[in-house]
Amino acid sequence: MNENIDKDFSSHTPMMQQYLKLKAQHPEILLFYRMGDFYELFYDDAKRASQLLDISLTKRGASAGEPIPMAGIPYHAVENYLAKLVNQGESVAICEQIGDPATSKGPVERKVVRIVTPGTISDEALLQERQDNLLAAIWQDSKGFGYATLDISSGRFRLSEPADRETMAAELQRTNPAELLYAEDFAEMSLIEGRRGLRRRPLWEFEIDTARQQLNLQFGTRDLVGFGVENAPRGLCAAGCLLQYAKDTQRTTLPHIRSITMEREQDSIIMDAATRRNLEITQNLAGGAENTLASVLDCTVTPMGSRMLKRWLHMPVRDTRVLLERQQTIGALQDFTAELQPVLRQVGDLERILARLALRTARPRDLARMRHAFQQLPELRAQLETVDSAPVQALREKMGEFAELRDLLERAIIDTPPVLVRDGGVIASGYNEELDEWRALADGATDYLERLEVRERERTGLDTLKVGFNAVHGYYIQISRGQSHLAPINYMRRQTLKNAERYIIPELKEYEDKVLTSKGKALALEKQLYEELFDLLLPHLEALQQSASALAELDVLVNLAERAYTLNYTCPTFIDKPGIRITEGRHPVVEQVLNEPFIANPLNLSPQRRMLIITGPNMGGKSTYMRQTALIALMAYIGSYVPAQKVEIGPIDRIFTRVGAADDLASGRSTFMVEMTETANILHNATEYSLVLMDEIGRGTSTYDGLSLAWACAENLANKIKALTLFATHYFELTQLPEKMEGVANVHLDALEHGDTIAFMHSVQDGAASKSYGLAVAALAGVPKEVIKRARQKLRELESISPNAAATQVDGTQMSLLSVPEEISPAVEALENLDPDSLTPRQALEWIYRLKSLV
């Protein structure tokens, strides 16, 4: 708002005084001020809106002697404009006319009826269908952080108490809130800077006693012991602020928020922000959703199922009872997916419809969709009855039937209702006798008008006479200009057109009053009956929410059963001791995008074999092999089947990845600094139950520094921490580690080279790689031939300095990036290195195809 606007408002017109008083209550956000068929914005709001929405900036008269900048949007298109603003992180106060213009003296009474913010939206048009939309609050004191999240579109309310900065950063990455509330004295601003939807809140909103009082009031409880959050003061501070903000913005009760859950670190596998990013769980490194784990696993048929699956993927559980139950359910459902999925698809997004019901913002089509969901329940229950699985039967019971509510909605709502109740025509005929009577009066107009037109034509003999209606002038009798001089004396002129005259007669005027009254009465009664439907449905809200949750879970499990069958996944076995044994493991995403068969590989990690030093050429598949191990572990710990022939997996508490790096220029951190920060986090927090992926540690600095750091890190992980570690490196010295300490083994990925060409085998073999094939990879990448030629010359010089260079490495510190070309056929070389006795029939067949391609 302009600073020069008069603060006492007295110099402004009455309408602008009303606007300015309302705007003063919401200074930080845009105010949509309803005027007739438009929402208007004034002053700085108008200037901002015109830029954000690309709409015209005009002026509206003057107030206090100054022209008023103005922008406006039609009320019927408001959802589209709100969606644009919310996507840009803006919040909007919606101000409606609540008084009657006919009876108002001065400006019509108006008030703000709701505030739309990025984290508190529930409207279907504003939400991403298959993603959670979270409001979050963060609090910090000397003991750590408090963090709370609320999905207002489902009522899911969670809190946690991250102990340190890294854990807090991981939580922010996992939950990715649309809006984040923070205290005005929040110390760790660098943690949240740059995030969307940041909202600074006063300190008193985070007060612990107020928080307890707010939460008890919301849940109708005397204390919070039953929710297991009583001893989480930091989390409660965040939750209290969050709940108050939700109430302030919605301007109504929130009956669908009926509990709060504590999320504890020990309940799930912890993944830091870097790990979530590197594993590309729901978002790829470019920020998109293609070629992610979710893109392969998510063939759910309901939006609420899709959102639940993504929550599972970001919070793998450690409770093997839960996991075994999910595995059993997936196994039991495999023969039923084709029958269940088409019916589940018809259920739709019941979860979000129920939230809108609770907020009393559900539209007629929401109730029609709810009715359609209820109509699927009998068939779903009948199909599930034959499934021999206790967890499936438990879900079937939770689903309920709701025959009474289905019957109510079938009687009350027409088959295909309009978008808004204000347009009428929502309540079905036969539901309410009085409504039917008023409608009959209003609908009888057509017959009456046709009869009147025939009668008057016959009486007057005027063939151009017709009876009509428009919204401005009401009912009329129209006669062409050529015959208007013959109009009877009792015809009173109502409107003159270019080619016709319009008249009214007392009988038509009387009927008009009657029809318009009956239409108004019918519409008012219809709105009342619609509100009463909410009162009839809301007592069942808790059972309905349980049903939606059960249907979403069923969708996820049926989806995982279908994926397991279609993609040839196997059920993993959980074992008590740390370790991972994989037979013919595959990368779930890479195998889907390859145009050729994926080369499956084994893996064996155990207390006796805790670390694998992985060597081999760039592009040879080291990173794929490492990531597929982490993804198989993650999939196993959501209860899913996995891409392998056989998997045995022990307890895992954390998954760490130090894979690739880019400069974090915004924070002033180089590639090497980023790498070392992530490495420090691993060395401080990994345990013997952690799975650690380390790729090319130390390459961001000088050779000797890098090698020393890589050696020390590997030694620490293997000897002290004893974590299950995959350690990929180009430092050939590290392949000596197995000789110097127990529990370490070498594996390598092979390649065949001929001149400037190279064939990657992508198969993991025991032992260290003999060379790095850097020259061939460089040629493959399109490095100019003269550069490759000069590199060969330089390599010969280096070899002459170090006679054993070919057998060892340049300067004895780093695997050779360049290799002397050998004029041996790659097929011959392949055969020389081949041990035929070690091949399975399938591998032998694969080798024949490879050799054929090398000739």
Swiss-Prot record:
A single GO molecular function term of this UniProt record: ATP binding
Q: Which domain of life is it from?
A: Bacteria
Extract the CDD domains matched here.
ABC_MutS1
**SMART domains, alphabetized:** MUTSac, MUTSd
What family does the Swiss-Prot or TrEMBL record give for this protein?
Answer: Belongs to the DNA mismatch repair MutS family.
Q: What does this protein do?
A: This protein is involved in the repair of mismatches in DNA. It is possible that it carries out the mismatch recognition step. This protein has a weak ATPase activity.
Where ATP binds, per the record, is at: 616-623
Keyword vocabulary terms for this entry: ATP-binding, DNA damage, DNA repair, DNA-binding, Nucleotide-binding
One GO cellular component term:
cytosol
Q: Which InterPro entries match?
A: DNA_mismatch_repair_MutS, DNA_mismatch_repair_MutS-lik_N, DNA_mismatch_repair_MutS/MSH, DNA_mismatch_repair_MutS_C, DNA_mismatch_repair_MutS_clamp, DNA_mismatch_repair_MutS_core, DNA_mismatch_repair_MutS_N, DNA_mismatch_repair_MutS_sf
Pfam families referenced in this protein's UniProt entry, alphabetically: MutS_I, MutS_II, MutS_III, MutS_IV, MutS_V
Q: What is this protein called?
A: DNA mismatch repair protein MutS
The record's annotation in PANTHER family points to: DNA MISMATCH REPAIR PROTEIN MSH1, MITOCHONDRIAL, DNA MISMATCH REPAIR PROTEIN MUTS FAMILY MEMBER
Q: Which PROSITE patterns match?
A: DNA_MISMATCH_REPAIR_2 (PS00486)
Q: Which NCBIfam families match?
A: mutS1, PRK05399.1
Query: What GO terms describe the biological role, i.e. biological process, of this protein?
Result: mismatch repair
